[in-house]
Curated annotation (Swiss-Prot):
It comes from Staphylococcus aureus. DNA-invertase, mediating the inversion of inv. This is Transposon Tn552 DNA-invertase BinR. Keywords: DNA integration, DNA invertase, DNA recombination, DNA-binding, Plasmid, Transposable element. One of its GO terms (biological process) is DNA integration. InterPro entries: Homeodomain-like_sf (IPR009057), Recombinase_CS (IPR006118), Resolv_N (IPR006119), Resolvase-like_N_sf (IPR036162), Resolvase_HTH_dom (IPR006120), SSR_resolvase (IPR050639). Transmembrane segments: none annotated. Residues 163-182 bind DNA.
Length: 192
């Protein structure tokens, strides 16, 4: 039996392409995850492995859908082989089982390239964040209140205006107002 496994890293990505390819290949059952490959817990993959029986083949669209790094891929494929389950990657067109030396060689090569590609992506992302910080951008949501708002907020609070009223004025929660007040108090304490 051919058992498919599909994975996307974020909720913004879509499984349709992978599932279509797995169906075209003849997979009778498809398991999936919406989770980064860097996470060790992948319930869909775990269910696919539990479901697979000796003689079955687990099929993925691309090798990088299966694992975080070369060591994980090798461990996983060895586990499958020990259970008598083979593995096939559609894009790389490799089948891995104990009987195929060529399949083992290709698997190790493609696993190394998949890990290399992931590391490049991580390096680029890190470099991008560092460059953004150097330009004064720190990511995350923009602040709700600017410096002028904070000055007015502090004045209103010091004059006894209720937190609820202050929060309504800026259309934010009371928690947000308290967070800004704590931030202001911390700044004042640092300045002393």
């Amino acid at each position: 039996m051919k058992i498919g496994y599909a994975r996307v890293s974020t909720g913004l990505q879509n499984l349709n392409l992978q599932e279509d390819r797995l169906n075209q290949y003849g997979c009778e059952k498809i398991f999936s995850d919406h989770i980064s490959g860097a996470k060790s817990k992948r319930p869909g993959l775990d269910r696919a492995i539990e479901f697979a029986r000796s003689g079955d083949t687990i099929v993925v669209w691309r090798l990088d859908r299966l694992g975080r790094n070369m060591a994980d891929l090798i461990t996983l494929v060895n586990e499958l082989n020990n259970r008598g389950v083979s593995f096939h990657s559609l894009e790389e067109n490799i089948t891995m089982d104990k009987s195929s030396s060529t399949g083992q060689l290709l698997f190790h090569l493609f696993a190394a390239f998949a890990e290399f590609e992931r590391n490049l992506i991580l390096e680029r992302s890190s470099a991008g964040r560092i460059a953004a910080r150097a330009r004064g951008r720190y990511g995350g949501r923009p602040e709700k209140l600017n410096k002028q708002d904070l000055t007015l907020l502090k004045t209103l609070y010091d004059n006894g205006t209720p937190i609820k009223t202050i929060a309504e004025q800026w259309k934010v929660s009371r928690t947000t107002i308290y967070r800004y007040l704590n931030k202001l108090n911390n700044q004042e304490n640092k300045d002393k």
